[in-house]
Amino acid sequence: MKPTQAQMAPAMDSREMVSPAVDLVLGASACCLACVFTNPLEVVKTRLQLQGELQAPGTYPRPYRGFVSSVAAVARADGLWGLQKGLAAGLLYQGLMNGVRFYCYSLACQAGLTQQPGGTVVAGAAAGALGAFVGSPAYLVKTQLQAQTVATMAVGHQHQHQGVLSALETIWRQQGMLGLWRGVGGAVPRVTVGSAAQLATFTSAKAWVQDRQWFLEDSWLVTLAGGMISSIAVVAVMTPLDVVSTRLYNQPVDRAGRGQLYGGLADCLVKTCQQEGPLALYKGLGPAYLRLGPHTILSMFFWDELRKLVARAQHQGT
């Protein structure tokens, strides 16, 4: 019996193969485009994750309550443009992290590593880890900028940066080069599991949808459906590490550049669960899905469709 596409779970359709360098550009571009649409949700998610940090439930004010009211609260406090706080840093992060991530994943596909059992998971995880490390300084600045607001609505530590370049300069001057990678211990596991889930499930989900024959073989709806299924897996595995990563990046530091609240990933997990309860690791889950879900769907959709266009153009030119 002939195996289905889902059983074969091809890492990359041979008709859509492009060079790793092209994948770098397409992956970075696709995720930057998705970021423009989802950044307001990232602002809300960041503030919900910082609200009530290391305080017992019910003992702190809650300026942000749920998704819709939080969007309105941000707009009232910071203006409509406040919903795009940290956008420049977010675009820088998406370009750096996903450019590296898709480049490395494409190299793995080209080498045939993703055709091995579990290959897509391993390749996605390794590519995500490297991308997270490269993009960490941009994510650090993005988180701190998105947390900044007026005193009456402030949650978490307020860093008072004036912009991306100002923030990078301040961190470099006060903490040195290593300060730019503070919090990377939470970012790498976060993106590692998220990338593994995203790239592996997107490949399998797209093949599964194709097998159902709900849409034409090359329809963009196949890609969209694959992205929607993939987004569920991404949010499920990333949210606890996303909360931890946000807090590690935003915490104040002493003169030596050491975090004043957490000693690292494990310390943050333990303190958060002890003082706020285990459910605190899912703070901002609604906005997290509303942000990570559409971002996963849009980024994978843009990436896959752009790859098809480039591959067809290359094929027609030969």
From Swiss-Prot:
Protein name from the UniProt record: Solute carrier family 25 member 34
Family note: Belongs to the mitochondrial carrier (TC 2.A.29) family.
Keywords: Membrane, Mitochondrion, Mitochondrion inner membrane, Repeat, Transmembrane, Transmembrane helix, Transport
Membrane topology, record value: Multi-pass membrane protein
Catalytic activity: a dicarboxylate(in) + sulfate(out) = a dicarboxylate(out) + sulfate(in)
Domain of life: Eukaryota
Subcellular location(s) per record: Mitochondrion inner membrane
Keyword Ubl conjugation part of the UniProt annotation: no
Family matches, as PANTHER family: RE38146P (PTHR45928), SOLUTE CARRIER FAMILY 25 MEMBER 34 (PTHR45928:SF3)
Keyword Cytoplasm: no
Residues annotated as signal peptide: none
GO cellular component term, pick one: mitochondrion
Function, as annotated: Putative antiporter that exchanges dicarboxylates and sulfur oxoanions across the inner membrane of mitochondria.
Main location: mitochondrion
Annotated transmembrane regions: 21-41, 59-79, 112-134, 184-205, 220-240, 292-315
